[in-house]
Each structure stands twice: as C-alpha cells, then as structure tokens.
C-alpha cells in the first residue's frame, strides 16, 4: 500500500489524497516541434536589478481559447508588455529581461512557459486552481491571481515588492 501516483496537469488537491503527486512539464523537449533546444537557454541572464519591472506577455491563443480573454486583459493593463516573438531564442531572451511573465494554461493546466520563466529567473503569473495550489506546496515562486482581471489593478510598486519577496526563493531554486 505504500505507493504514489504521479500525474501532470493534476487538478485535484494533493492535500485531499496523499498518494497523489503533481508531475511538472518542465521545458519543451526537442522532439516537441523542435522547440526545446537547451541552447535557447545558454546566455547571461540579466541581473535582477536590470530586469524590467513589468509583466511579459507573449503567447498565442491557438492552444486554449481562454487565452483570448487573457490577451485582451493584458493589453488593458499598464504593467503588462504584450510582445510577439519571431523565434524561440528571441522569446527566451526577451522573457529573461522581465521580472514577471503571464503563464496562462495551454492545452492542459500546465504550460512550458511557467518552467521556462523560472529557468531565466522570471516569476510566473498564473490563475489559481487546484493544480496551481499543488505547485505552491512545492515552494515554487509564482504570483497567483484569482482572476486575470487583477492584472489591471497591479502597480509597478506592487511588482517591485513582490519580486523582492520572491527573489531569495527564485535564486535558491530549491523547488
């Protein structure tokens, strides 16, 4: 009876069933549309003092129609920079220059964008769910919103304070 079930996109609280564990996606692998080349991450990540005190928004709406609303809201926010990227390497480099990044769900609840953000010391911004609460219990730094509309009420001062709060956890990388 001593066994555990590991699952990606686990949207059931691990508090309710101790035999369940969330299994993170991680970054894309090279067999996944040839996007996951590790050399996309080989460059000097900007020091946290030089990162933009904004939220990076760069995602398409093809994988999940809920993203259309997230994109609309992000364009209304004063602290979100919406960008399109020409290729994967440029996307990762741009991502690394921001303190925060919007990480809406993809085909499932998890998204590679979440893990790519952490690799370049950018805080993922996510919408709360049982899945996100499972990740929170793993001590992963993230900004959790109850509703994407909250993006319109966050100030740059809020972002600065939140980044400083999460920075030790982000630098330690013990998650």
Give residue ranges: language-model regions.
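Nucleotide-sugar donor-binding catalytic core of glycosyltransferases
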Residues: 1-115, 119-140, 166-174
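A charged, aromatic-enriched C-terminal amphipathic alpha-helix characteristic of glycosyltransferases
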Residues: 153-175
């Amino acid at each position: 009876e001593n066994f555990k079930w590991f699952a990606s996109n686990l949207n059931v609280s691990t508090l309710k069933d101790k035999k369940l564990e969330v299994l993170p996606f991680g970054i894309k692998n090279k067999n996944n549309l040839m996007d996951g080349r590790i050399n996309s991450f080989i460059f000097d990540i900007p020091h946290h003092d030089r990162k933009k005190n904004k939220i990076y928004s760069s995602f398409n709406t093809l994988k999940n129609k809920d993203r259309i609303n997230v994109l609309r809201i992000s364009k209304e926010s004063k602290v979100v920079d919406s960008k399109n990227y020409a290729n994967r390497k440029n996307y990762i480099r741009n991502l690394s220059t921001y303190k925060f990044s919007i990480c809406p769900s993809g085909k499932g609840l998890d998204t590679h964008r979440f893990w790519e953000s952490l690799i370049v010391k950018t805080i993922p911004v996510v919408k709360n769910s049982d899945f996100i609460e499972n990740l929170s219990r793993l001590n992963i730094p993230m900004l959790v919103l109850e509703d994407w509309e909250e993006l319109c009420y966050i100030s740059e001062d809020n972002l600065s304070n939140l980044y400083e709060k999460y920075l030790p956890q982000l630098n330690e990388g013990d998650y």
